[in-house]
Amino acid sequence: MKRIIVTGCNGQLGRAVNREYENNPEFEIINTDVDKLDITCIEKVLGFVEAVNPYAIINCAAMTAVDGCEKEIDAAYKVNAVGPRNLAIAAEKTGAKLVHISTDYVFAGDAKEPYTEFDEPSPVSMYGKSKWQGEKFVKEFCRKHFIIRTAWLYGEGKNFVRTMLSLAEKMPEVSVVCDQVGSPTSAKELAKAIYYLIDTSNYGTYHGTCEDMCSWADFATEIFRLAGKSTKVNYITSEDYARMYPNSAKRPAYSVLDNYMLRLIGGYRFADWKTALSEYFD
């Protein structure tokens, strides 16, 4: 039986990964979260990983609060950069594969067409900078790695979909940014891609998002449509949002990722974002 360590097991992706593997007797999932394993401590990581001797490590742990990363820079770099470095060192030492989840925020967000894996990152926020450093550490310390950049993730837990549905219960209308464009991605779809990659030797950096694109306001509109809500969506600009929340971190205006490498290695495709969102509501 192949053992797989999943960090951040209680998050959206961690839960989706567990569901993806739950009926496969070939794998044993070893779940960890911050209470069980502090990935920022190299001694604890090495001790844990060496004791388990896993086939693979799937790192779903991250500090994802974009505004929080601006305020707690040290914490952001510890979790998003030092943590992945420690896991990479441990994976290399034990011969394990490492799946590391990254983000569209490693790019500046000023492109006119989807970013491929061959475009050079240039993050503008502390969240993006810390995640980019994490990627570099993974590549430096672990040969058998899969770095998967994703975006606008939703699943079980706190996310944009749940936030919109909660607001719909309290308010007749909501204001949502219309000039930030990306690809909403279900944790279930991302977990399926991880499952596809992990048993291969196609190591490297990948983009993993649902197909097609929309604005946050379009996303909210589709959420309310599928939920049967009459909540009105007011389309506002990023400048409007910045005036409303002056201390918020800068967000990418265009962070659409092209899953180019997945197509190159075998034609794997994600569902389009509307189909995946519809399945989420079923």
Predicted features and spans:
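N-terminal Rossmann NAD(P)H-binding glycine-rich loop of SDR-like oxidoreductase domains
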Residues: R3-E22
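SDR active-site strand-loop-helix element
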Residues: T7, T32, I57-A61, L98-T103, ...
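Adenosine-cofactor binding site in Rossmann-like domains, unifying the SAM/SAH pocket
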Residues: E28-G47
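NAD(P)H-binding glycine-rich loop region in Rossmannoid oxidoreductase-like domains
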Residues: I42-V79
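Catalytic helix-loop patch of NAD(P)-dependent Rossmann-fold dehydrogenases
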Residues: K78, G83-N86, K93, V106-I148, ...
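NAD(P)-dependent short-chain dehydrogenase/reductase
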Residues: K136-G182, K188-E189, Y195
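Mid/C-terminal beta-alpha module of Rossmann-like enzyme folds, strongest
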Residues: T200-P246
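Conserved C-terminal active-site "lid" loop/helix of NAD(P)H-dependent oxidoreductases
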Residues: S215-T221, D240-F281
